[in-house]
């Protein structure tokens, strides 16, 4: 019978607009369908009142709902559908990706966001792998998805939700079947199945045969985890059933008022219809069991196609249930009558399974997850230092997953070191910070902290200390309540340790750095320029340290602007590659850094030779900076333009540079973090990425030459665990003449950009109190030193003279324009 009916696209993605359907001559549009077609007399509000859709519904959802109603009228009145609808269905059939299961008559639901390129049905092998992964990894869907291989994380997560719900429902149905008498009808999950006679469903068999199981699940897919639909839609089953005896609960608010088949409205945002398996020997009266699932704390509201909500008051929900009971009194003799006492029992069963409506506040209280406190250990635990227990592998799984950086040997080293430190300081409390200095190159501080927490929770360390905390609340997984006590406790430990991975809410401080929100509470900030900051640090170094007897103020443990001296490469740790820099790049970096007391920034272009292990820096491209005086970041637009300029010259981006105008060319903690991120990003393609820091006016440097540091960031962690160690390269200058015209044009651009800035350096002022050179003369000395290695002195002097004249002329024109402006202002004041 199902094969004779036209295939209906229930997704509605390509549904025709209601206006278009009407224009084709269809008289009964969805907005004017009478309730007589659908509702029993006890449900009608008015015999002649037409249905109207809520005006707040969007046009897209309105079209989908109206199309569904038009299709229902076709089934009920045997009227032909409009030509527009048939055309849209044919177009949808051409565009849609057909499921291979459609050949057997089973209707599958495709994702509304993307066509299904995979089998929506879970195979038995996938289900077995899912259950194995659940036992092995718990609720870690990423790992379970990797174990299965053929499913994504979202698919596994969606399947797991239905798996746990069905498992809970099946447990409840087994208890119900044991307590029920043999004379009652079959039940499942505490909901009695009503037998409907053929008379009540006359003319409604066709739409039921074409019914589709629709679930609104998380993220992007619908997962069918029951095998019941296969048997129901098989040809043999359909022949045995005939036309009459299927009933389903409507799946959406638009279908909810179509008949009296459902005694209860569905709850929450998702509901599932599972069809009860039919006994092959008894096909006279098949039944359908409706399972209504709740997601969290349900409220009496439902979403129409996920767009607008139809709110129902609690009293209206009860009235709806009462009307449904009244509507069932008109059943034929084939239906079983339900007495008031049985109805109360049914409501109690529904309430036990969380399927009956409650007031919103009551439902919220009932569904709140309770945090279970872990019991403190009764005695101190002694751990064998040479072995790793299975409980440890379950609690700290990251060291036993085959990672290159986190191995079981490293876990043993960290664990045994923490145990040794506890033996030394016992009975004094052993905190996490005190064990970090002895665990260099053993991973990040977070994984060390998790091992410390695990040992503390089981009583291996800090036993009997007041500071030890055992009641770390974490929702317990109720699906593991039937497992052994030891397994459950180990799983709870793993859950608590995994909860430590969640990051705290972080905000930006006044300098733009990410930090914990609590770190900013009660603080005041003083805004200093880079020069003032360097001067203040010098003064603090010169001040004698005073030992105060009273309580001294605790200094902040993290300063993003703290300068970190670079380590030198040794024979044990050799340079990964050599760095050669062209004279052009050195000249541009010097020019750029000398004209501003704020930090400047730019990109380095060149090439990397894998065979020779050499990085050649051939060009430097200045960029606009987003500077606050204390730090600078590269402007994204300017960065893109600089990358394109380097690519046009045939160079790759192999590094970046920035200036420390008046302090040492050592990277700050923030610079280290930025450089490490760049290195990680570029290393994916096998490229190298270096950082260079130029310090033109360092007060600790009496020489007129700029200080330049070329560095990379290693994987080694500092003693306090707050940063990775930077390493410094020895720079070799390439013996090639620069492109004179290009440098001259870059110089003109730099002067034009910075001469009007507030941070502009007065090039005619003395650069250092112990020197007679002006800032411009100092710049020329730096350039003279660079050019002395690549060209003869005559060419170099001629070029430097041109650079000097360019600076003088442009800065003089600036002074002249300023003088004219001041003169005009004075004259206007006198005239007024």
Curated annotation (Swiss-Prot):
GO terms for molecular function: DNA binding; histone binding; histone H2A deubiquitinase activity; metal ion binding; metal-dependent deubiquitinase activity; transcription coactivator activity. It is found in: Nucleus. The gene is MYSM1. Residues 579-711 form the MPN domain. CDD domains: MPN_2A_DUB (cd08067), SANT (cd00167). Residues 1-33, 92-111, 167-191 are annotated as: Disordered. Residues 117-168 form the SANT domain. Metalloprotease that specifically deubiquitinates monoubiquitinated histone H2A, a specific tag for epigenetic transcriptional repression, thereby acting as a coactivator. Preferentially deubiquitinates monoubiquitinated H2A in hyperacetylated nucleosomes. Deubiquitination of histone H2A leads to facilitate the phosphorylation and dissociation of histone H1 from the nucleosome. Acts as a coactivator by participating in the initiation and elongation steps of androgen receptor (AR)-induced gene activation. Keywords: Activator, Chromatin regulator, DNA-binding, Hydrolase, Metal-binding, Metalloprotease, Nucleus, Protease, Transcription, Transcription regulation, Ubl conjugation pathway, Zinc. Belongs to the peptidase M67A family. MYSM1 subfamily. This is Histone H2A deubiquitinase MYSM1. A motif (LXXLL motif) lies at residues 776-780. GO terms for biological process: chromatin remodeling; positive regulation of transcription by RNA polymerase II; proteolysis. Residues 1-12 have a biased composition (Acidic residues).
């Amino acid at each position: 019978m199902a094969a004779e009916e036209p295939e209906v696209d229930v997704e509605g993605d390509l549904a025709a607009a209601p206006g278009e359907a009407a224009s084709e001559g269809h008289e009964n549009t969805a907005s004017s369908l009478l309730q007589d077609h659908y509702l029993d007399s006890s449900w009608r509000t008015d015999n002649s009142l037409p249905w109207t859709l809520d005006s707040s519904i969007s046009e897209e959802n309105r079209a989908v709902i109206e199309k569904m109603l038009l299709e229902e009228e076709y089934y009920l009145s045997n009227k032909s559908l409009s030509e527009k609808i048939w055309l849209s269905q044919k177009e949808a059939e051409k565009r849609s990706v057909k499921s291979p299961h459609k050949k057997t008559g089973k209707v599958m639901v495709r994702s509304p966001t993307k066509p299904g390129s995979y089998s929506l049905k879970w195979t038995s092998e996938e289900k077995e792998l899912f259950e194995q992964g659940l036992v092995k990894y718990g609720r870690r869907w990423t790992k379970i998805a990797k174990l299965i291989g053929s499913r994504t994380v979202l698919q596994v997560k969606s399947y797991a939700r239905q798996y746990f719900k069905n498992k809970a429902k099946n447990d409840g149905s087994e208890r119900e079947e044991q307590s029920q008498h043999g004379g009652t009808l079959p039940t499942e999950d505490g909901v009695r199945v009503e037998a409907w006679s053929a008379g009540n469903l006359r003319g409604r068999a066709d739409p039921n045969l074409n019914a589709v199981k629709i679930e609104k699940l998380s993220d992007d897919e619908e997962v069918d985890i029951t095998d019941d639909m296969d048997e129901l839609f098989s040809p043999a089953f359909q022949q045995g059933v005939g036309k009459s005896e299927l009933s389903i609960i409507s799946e959406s608010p638009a279908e909810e008022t179509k008949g009296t088949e459902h005694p209860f409205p569905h709850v929450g945002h998702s509901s599932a219809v599972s069809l009860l398996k039919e006994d092959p020997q008894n096909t006279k009266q098949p039944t359908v069991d409706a399972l209504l699932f709740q997601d969290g704390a349900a409220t009496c509201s439902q979403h129409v196609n996920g767009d607008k909500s139809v709110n129902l008051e609690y009293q209206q929900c009860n009235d709806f249930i009462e009307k449904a009971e009244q509507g069932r009194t008109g059943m034929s003799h084939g239906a079983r009558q339900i007495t008031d006492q049985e109805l109360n029992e049914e409501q109690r069963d529904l309430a036990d399974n969380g399927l009956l409506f409650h007031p919103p506040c009551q439902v919220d209280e009932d569904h709140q997850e309770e945090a279970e406190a872990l019991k403190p250990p009764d005695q101190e635990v002694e751990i064998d230092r040479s072995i790793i227990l299975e409980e440890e592998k379950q609690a700290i799984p990251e060291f036993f997953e085959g990672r290159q950086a986190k191995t079981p040997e490293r876990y043993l080293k960290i664990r045994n070191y923490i145990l040794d430190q506890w033996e030394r300081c016992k009975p004094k409390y052993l905190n996490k910070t005190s064990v970090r200095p002895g665990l260099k190159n053993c991973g990040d501080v977070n994984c060390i902290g998790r091992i410390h927490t695990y040992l503390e929770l089981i009583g291996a360390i800090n036993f009997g200390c007041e500071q030890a905390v055992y009641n770390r609340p974490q929702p317990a997984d109720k699906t593991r309540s039937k497992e052994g006590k030891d397994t459950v406790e180990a799983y709870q430990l793993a859950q608590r340790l995994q909860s430590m991975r969640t990051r705290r809410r972080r905000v930006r401080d006044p300098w733009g750095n990410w930090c914990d929100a609590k770190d900013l509470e009660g603080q005041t900030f003083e805004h200093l320029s880079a020069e003032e900051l360097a001067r203040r640090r010098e003064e603090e170094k010169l001040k004698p340290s005073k030992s105060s007897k009273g309580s001294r103020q605790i200094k902040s443990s993290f300063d993003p602007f703290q300068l970190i001296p670079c380590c030198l490469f040794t024979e044990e740790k050799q340079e990964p590659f050599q760095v050669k820099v062209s004279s052009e790049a050195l000249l541009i970096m010097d020019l750029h850094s000398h004209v501003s007391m704020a930090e400047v920034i730019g990109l380095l272009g060149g090439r990397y030779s894998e065979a020779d292990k050499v990085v050649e820096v051939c060009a430097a491209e200045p960029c606009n900076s987003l500077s606050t005086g204390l730090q600078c970041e590269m402007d994204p637009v300017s960065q893109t333009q600089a990358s394109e300029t380097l690519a046009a010259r045939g160079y790759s981006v192999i590094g970046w540079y920035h200036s420390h105008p008046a302090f040492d060319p050592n990277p700050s903690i923030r610079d280290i973090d930025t450089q490490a991120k760049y290195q990680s990003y570029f290393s994916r393609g096998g490229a190298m990425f270096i950082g260079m820091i130029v310090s033109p006016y360092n007060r600790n440097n009496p020489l007129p030459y700029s200080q330049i540091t070329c560095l990379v960031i290693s994987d080694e962690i500092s003693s306090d665990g707050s940063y990775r160690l930077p390493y410094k390269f020895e720079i070799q200058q390439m013996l090639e003449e620069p492109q004179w015209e290009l440098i001259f044009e870059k110089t003109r651009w730099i002067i034009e950009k910075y001469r009007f800035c507030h941070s502009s350096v007065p090039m005619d002022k003395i650069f250092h109190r112990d020197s007679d050179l002006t800032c411009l003369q100092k710049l020329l000395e730096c350039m003279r030193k660079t050019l002395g290695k690549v060209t003869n002195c005559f060419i170099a002097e001629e070029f430097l003279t041109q650079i000097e004249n360019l600076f003088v002329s442009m800065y003089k024109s600036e002074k002249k324009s300023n003088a004219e402006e001041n003169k005009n202002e004075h004259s206007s004041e006198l005239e007024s």
